[in-house]
UniProtKB/Swiss-Prot annotation:
Name of the molecule in the record: Large ribosomal subunit protein eL18
Signal peptide: none
Entry-linked SUPFAM superfamilies: Ribosomal proteins L15p and L18e (SSF52080)
Family: Belongs to the eukaryotic ribosomal protein eL18 family.
Gene that produces this protein: RpL18
Length: 183
């Protein structure tokens, strides 16, 4: 008598194509799918995989974090590649000169990078400048920075759990029954 084999772990769960209907994103996917196939560079495969990702998995990156990553001495003259959005950070006083390639850059962040003498590339411009990803550095935003992530983990109240509970309101108000006014 044979055994019933459990096949629930057989498939690899990841996106194999972009879910968005955005034509510009789909054109980038076409371009990087071609580059990933024709060049033997790991960089293009990583960019392609990140282009497939959902918005949650392409978190925004602040200018201050980007500047902190790019001011390392080994990263001088490299192109920062962000498959996502670069946002402004008012806490950063002086923006260093840097070359950035990103899917989207907010208006204020764009102005500050360009004022510092920096350069902002689109991904199709990046493909022409660095088709194999030479002299580039891939940078991501924090995926666990979302407020929703605080609610994940062992149940709130469990030992050593720092999970935030889902609470409608704090205080004695929630214990009150809804009163009907006599009309």
């Amino acid at each position: 008598m044979g055994i019933d084999i459990n096949h629930k772990h057989d498939r690899k769960v990841r996106r194999t194509e972009v879910k968005s209907q955005d034509v510009y994103l789909r054109l980038l996917v076409k371009l990087y799918r071609y580059l990933a196939r024709r060049t033997n560079a790991k960089f293009n495969q990583i960019v392609l995989r990140r282009l497939f990702m959902s918005r949650i998995n392409r978190p925004p990156l602040s200018l201050s974090r980007l500047a902190r990553h790019m001011k390392k001495p080994t990263r001088e003259g490299l192109i920062a590649v962000v498959v996502g959005t670069i946002t402004n950070d008012t806490r950063l006083y002086k923006v260093p000169k840097m070359t950035v390639a990103a899917l989207h850059v907010t208006e204020k962040a764009r102005a500050r990078i360009l004022d510092a003498g920096g350069e902002i590339l689109t991904f199709d411009q990046l493909a022409l400048r660095a088709p194999t990803g030479r002299k580039t550095v891939l940078i991501q935003g924090q995926r666990n920075a979302r407020e929703a992530v605080r609610h994940f983990g062992p149940a709130p109240g469990a030992p050593r759990s720092h999970t935030k509970p889902y609470v409608r309101s704090k205080g004695h108000e929630q214990a009150k029954p809804s009163r009907r006014s006599n009309v």
